[in-house]
């Protein structure tokens, strides 16, 4: 059921580069942390592969802005910019999607089948990445609380995820949450991708 994002697209576009730089900085700080504080891919080992996952896509548009823009388009715009910046800095990346489509397999016909297949394929992409780290991009929606804003990071149950989420959150608080800092939180088991990814995962929304 569609819900609405009470944020203007012009604001999102202005913030996009800042968010990308925040994520980029957090990933590199996390990777270069001292060995005794890093639990995944410590300095000197094979570099990680960042799997950039723009949430939703295709028929699954996610939430909808007050101007009629679907969440899937916003996620994709941010995901492409994050991917470009990471690659520009020499970071190996993989994207789960690079255009506004579902990545379900052939044979999925109903909306439910397509959604289930799409999620399974995203999990497969993450789990196939060498030394993978998942960064899933979403937009939260709280139409009953229009004063609520900002970005928050959530981690999955894999080793290293909490440290990365906290690094991302600290950078987000400095960049865009200065008035109302947020805390990174553990993601519950209800999010299929985060639950089944066999790599440290951070969902930002």
Predicted features along the sequence, with ranges:
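Catalytic-site microenvironment of enzymes
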Residues: 1-205
């Amino acid at each position: 059921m569609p819900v609405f994002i009470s944020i203007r697209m012009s604001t999102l576009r202005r913030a996009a580069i800042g968010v990308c730089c925040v994520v980029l900085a957090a990933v590199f700080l996390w990777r270069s942390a001292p060995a005794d504080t890093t639990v995944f891919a410590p300095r000197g080992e094979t570099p990680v592969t960042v799997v950039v996952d723009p949430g939703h896509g295709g028929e699954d548009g996610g939430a909808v802005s007050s101007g009629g823009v679907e969440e899937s388009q916003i996620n994709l715009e941010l995901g492409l910019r994050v991917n470009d910046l990471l690659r520009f800095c020499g970071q190996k990346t993989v994207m789960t999607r690079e255009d506004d489509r579902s990545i379900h397999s052939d044979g999925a016909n109903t909306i439910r089948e397509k959604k289930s297949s799409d999620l399974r394929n995203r999990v497969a992409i993450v789990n196939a990445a060498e030394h993978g780290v998942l960064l899933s991009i979403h937009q939260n929606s709280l139409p009953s609380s229009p004063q609520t804003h900002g970005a928050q990071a959530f981690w999955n149950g894999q080793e290293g995820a909490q440290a990365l989420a906290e690094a991302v959150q600290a950078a987000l608080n400095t960049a865009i949450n200065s008035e109302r800092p947020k805390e990174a939180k553990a993601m519950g088991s209800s999010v299929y991708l985060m639950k089944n990814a066999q790599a440290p995962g951070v969902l930002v929304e």
